[in-house]
């Protein structure tokens, strides 16, 4: 089993518990926004990520930082959840837990998550057209795009929906041609 699969197995019960708590508190949308904010903060601050993932830093210090950073910024349920993760020494799985949480919520709401890798930022018109195309392909009510800029793709884009990948990038085509030429020679 890959380490990513192992982490996903550990993260899933936490994500399920958070979905259940958020749903019973009628706060799914608020929790979604708060977790997206936290995920964005962690992605932008490598120091904060390293701090939370460092096992040598005591749980009390981590709890104090969570309280000072997020009190009055995010829903109290999110703060309590983060404190539980710190107590159980699972805060290092926060990225995976957030990802699993969002997957579960989107399943509840019949939303498809499409990860889009592109060399440049897509315009609103392009995003809208892509969303409509993905809705048609997946028969879903709504589509959530997670866009990542990857300049190495040169042109085109890669779309990942679940286990399905659609690669229309120039990088992917060149890689395919290279593999073909290596197999022939």
Curated annotation (Swiss-Prot):
Q: Does the keyword Lyase apply?
A: no
GO cellular component terms listed in the entry, alphabetical order: chloroplast thylakoid membrane; proton-transporting ATP synthase complex
The record, for Pfam families, names: OSCP (PF00213)
GO MF, one example? proton-transporting ATP synthase activity, rotational mechanism
Q: Which residues form a coiled coil?
A: none
Which keywords annotate this record?
ATP synthesis, CF(1), Chloroplast, Hydrogen ion transport, Ion transport, Membrane, Plastid, Thylakoid, Transport
Where does the record place it? Answer: Plastid, Chloroplast thylakoid membrane
PROSITE patterns documented for this protein: ATPASE_DELTA
Query: Chief localization class?
Result: plastid
Q: Which SUPFAM superfamilies match?
A: N-terminal domain of the delta subunit of the F1F0-ATP synthase
Membrane topology is: Peripheral membrane protein
* InterPro entries assigned to the protein according to its UniProt record, in alphabetical order: ATP_synth_OSCP/delta_N_sf, ATPase_OSCP/d_CS, ATPase_OSCP/dsu
Oligomeric form and interacting partners: F-type ATPases have 2 components, F(1) - the catalytic core - and F(0) - the membrane proton channel. F(1) has five subunits: alpha(3), beta(3), gamma(1), delta(1), epsilon(1). CF(0) has four main subunits: a(1), b(1), b'(1) and c(10-14). The alpha and beta chains form an alternating ring which encloses part of the gamma chain. F(1) is attached to F(0) by a central stalk formed by the gamma and epsilon chains, while a peripheral stalk is formed by the delta, b and b' chains.
PANTHER family according to UniProt: ATP SYNTHASE DELTA CHAIN (PTHR11910)
| Family statement drawn from the similarity comment of this UniProt entry | Belongs to the ATPase delta chain family.
Function summary: F(1)F(0) ATP synthase produces ATP from ADP in the presence of a proton or sodium gradient. F-type ATPases consist of two structural domains, F(1) containing the extramembraneous catalytic core and F(0) containing the membrane proton channel, linked together by a central stalk and a peripheral stalk. During catalysis, ATP synthesis in the catalytic domain of F(1) is coupled via a rotary mechanism of the central stalk subunits to proton translocation.
- Protein known as: ATP synthase subunit delta, chloroplastic
């Amino acid at each position: 089993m890959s380490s990513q699969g192992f982490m996903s197995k550990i993260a899933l019960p936490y994500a399920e518990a958070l979905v259940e708590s958020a749903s019973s508190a009628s706060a799914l949308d608020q929790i979604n926004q708060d977790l997206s904010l936290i995920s964005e903060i962690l992605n932008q601050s490598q120091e904060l990520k390293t701090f939370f993932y460092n096992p040598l830093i005591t749980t009390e210090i981590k709890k104090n930082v969570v309280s000072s950073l997020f009190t009055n910024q995010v829903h109290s349920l999110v703060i309590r959840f983060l404190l539980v993760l710190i107590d159980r020494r699972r805060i290092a799985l926060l990225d995976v837990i957030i990802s699993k949480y969002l997957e579960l919520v989107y399943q509840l709401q019949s939303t498809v998550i499409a990860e889009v890798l592109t060399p440049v930022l897509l315009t609103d018109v392009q995003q809208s057209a892509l969303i409509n195309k993905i809705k048609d392909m997946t028969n879903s009510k709504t589509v959530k795009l997670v866009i990542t800029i990857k300049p190495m793709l040169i042109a085109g884009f890669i779309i990942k929906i679940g286990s399905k990948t659609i690669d229309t990038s120039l990088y992917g085509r060149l890689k395919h041609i290279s593999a073909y030429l290596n197999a022939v020679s």
